[in-house]
A protein has these predicted regions:
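Hydrophobic alpha-helix-in-membranes signature
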Residues: 6-8, 195, 222
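Hydrophobic pocket-lining residues within nucleotide cofactor-binding pockets
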Residues: 42, 197-199, 222
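Active-site cores that bind ATP or allylic diphosphates and position pyrophosphate for catalysis
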Residues: 81, 94-217
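Single conserved hydrophobic/aromatic residue that forms the stacking wall/gate
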Residues: 219-226
Length: 226
């Protein structure tokens, strides 16, 4: 069993992402599994080394330790997406050569079947079903050869051997796309778990309008066990 978190160093660690990290860490530890931390920094314009350092420091402040990934290493080379662009391009071109994707104004789009269903069992929500007629062809490699989130995340989860993907339910609508990519790469599907979002007192998704929601702010005001 292997779980992961994949924060993007485009800002400080959000409390919602910290909750997701804690869930993955606890589930891995409770089941003698492996917990991996990778850095999703394909957004090279907004990603900074300062934010990456801040995220790592705050994960450690939360008491989390990881078995594989950034800083601790492992058997899969780099754990930063910005150093794996060649790998993503290789996969995109393979899908293109197999007529599972096509070029569109310099970009590469994944070809979604016209009909059918994508079904999977979610650890929290139970059986999920998506009609492919509601899913449009989607970009996997941009015209500048940078990967989209869908491609980079799926390739990494395959290459690193992730068996359970636990993340926020705001990503739920992307899961059918990821399942199609896993199948296109002839990969075994991981299990999925979509965690409920955190909400503020006004019943809306927790965001900066509710005040500072970064862990960096929290650890200045609360002890770790809080």
């Amino acid at each position: 069993m292997k779980l992961r978190i994949a924060p993007s160093p485009t800002g400080q660690l959000h409390i919602g992402n910290a909750r997701t990290a804690l869930f993955n860490w606890l589930y891995a530890k409770a089941n003698n599994g492996t917990f991996l931390v990778r850095i999703d920094d394909t957004d090279t314009e907004r990603s900074t080394s300062e934010y990456q350092k801040d995220i790592i420091e705050n994960l450690k402040w939360l008491g989390l330790n990881w078995d594989e990934g950034i800083e601790v290493g492992g058997s899969h080379g780099s754990y930063k997406q910005s150093s794996r662009f060649d790998r993503y391009q290789e996969v995109a071109e393979n899908l293109l050569s197999r007529n599972l994707a096509y070029e569109d104004d310099g970009a590469i789009r994944f070809k979604v079947p016209n009909d059918g269903l994508i079904e999977f069992e979610d650890y929290i929500r139970g059986k999920m079903s998506f009609n492919l007629s509601d899913v449009e062809d989607f970009v996997i490699l941009r015209s500048d050869k940078s990967p989209t989130y869908h491609l980079a995340s799926t390739v990494d989860d395959l290459d690193y051997g992730i068996t359970i993907i636990a993340r926020g339910e705001d990503i739920l609508s992307s899961t059918p796309k990821h399942i199609m990519l896993f199948k296109a790469m002839d990969a075994n599907l991981p299990d999925f778990c979509h965690l409920p979002l955190l909400f503020g007192p006004d019943g809306k998704k927790l965001s900066k309008r509710h005040g500072d929601t970064s862990v960096s702010y929290t650890h200045l005001t609360l002890p770790t066990k809080a």
